[in-house]
Curated annotation (Swiss-Prot):
GO molecular-function terms, A-Z: DNA-binding transcription factor activity; transcription cis-regulatory region binding
Gene: ilvY
Name the record gives this protein: HTH-type transcriptional activator IlvY
Signal peptide interval: none
Family: Belongs to the LysR transcriptional regulatory family.
Record localization: Cytoplasm
A biological process term (GO) from this entry: branched-chain amino acid biosynthetic process
Function: This protein activates the transcription of the IlvC gene in the presence of acetolactate or acetohydroxybutyrate. IlvY is also a negative regulator of its own expression.
Length: 295
């Protein structure tokens, strides 16, 4: 049984979405399906019940999840034991990311890193995702989780984690904005928009306006922080374009007040990854963190 197959299985068991897990594991959906089929053939049991959009674990799948978690943990512990025979790393590593990324992408990375380097102290700062790249460039953070800009600074190294789906969201509860967008062909030039004040998400909405030939959009507010954009949409202030993962990790009372109007096409993926200064990649702590990333 391949450890990579077990890692992929665990991600799918958590996400319950083939497309999302395929993007996160950097494989095609067909490759992901083959990995799951290989496990099912090895065990002689179906692991998932599939429908058009999601999957759910079978009883055999639940048992394999426990086995996979224990096996991968034991493997990490073995790696740690072997690493202890050599010089161990210690010190502080300063990481910056958004609140959403701290929930959605950072935990599994930190689990792997701390399993191998338990003496390293992690200093985590959260804030506006649009500031992440600048935090690395200025040295305020050793590493950051950031959306890849259209032009990556030459001094910055970027390791991709996932291509994120981008969605246009609107209020789900009755309000004037919902009435505007609920017709067959909304007049987007009159719909109020909540926009990011900077960063890749800001660039995305500008491209959206251009594609819809909106030269003078109605901007209700520009906001620092994608999480605040979701809250303003939930309050009925306008619509917003942002990564779907932000909505997925919003508090349930907020999430229930928002609906998705459309998803971006896959031709223009929103790349999320970890960045660091190229000239610092040789430093022991940053080098160790870089090596445990999926890429």
């Amino acid at each position: 049984m391949d450890l990579r197959d077990l890692k992929t299985f665990l991600h799918l068991a958590e996400s319950r979405h083939f497309g999302r897990s395929a993007r996160a594991m950097h494989v095609s959906p067909s490759t992901l399906s083959r990995q799951i089929q290989r496990l099912e053939e090895d065990l002689g049991q179906p692991l998932f019940v599939r429908d058009n959009r999601t999957v759910t674990l079978t009883e055999a799948g639940e048992e394999l999840r426990v086995f996979a978690q224990q096996t991968l943990l034991q493997y990490q512990q073995l790696r740690h034991t072997l690493d202890q025979q050599g010089p161990s790393l210690s010190g502080e590593l300063h990481i910056f990311c958004s609140v959403t990324a701290a929930y959605s992408h950072l935990p599994p990375i930190l689990d792997r890193f701390r399993a191998e380097h338990p003496s390293v102290e992690i200093k985590l700062t959260t804030g506006d995702a649009a500031d992440a790249m600048e935090k690395v460039v200025t040295g305020e953070a050793d590493l950051a989780i950031a959306g890849k800009p259209e032009t990556l600074p030459g001094a910055v190294a970027f390791s991709m984690l996932e291509n994120l789906a981008v969605v246009l969201i609107a209020p789900a509860l009755p309000c004037p904005v919902r009435n505007q967008v609920s017709v067959d062909k909304p007049d987007w030039s009159t719909v109020p928009f909540i926009m990011a004040d900077q960063g890749p998400v800001r660039r995305r909405i500008e491209l959206w306006f251009r594609r819809h030939k909106i030269s003078n959009p109605q901007i209700y507010a520009t906001v620092g922080g994608h999480e605040a954009m979701v809250s303003m949409v939930a309050l009925g202030c306008g619509v917003a374009l942002l990564p779907e993962v932000v909505l997925e990790n919003s508090p349930e009372p907020v999430r229930n007040r928002v609906m998705i109007l459309e998803r971006s096409d896959e031709k223009t993926p929103f790349e999320l990854g970890v960045c660091a200064q190229k000239k610092r990649l040789h430093e022991p702590l940053i080098d160790a963190f870089w090596k445990i990333l999926p890429n």
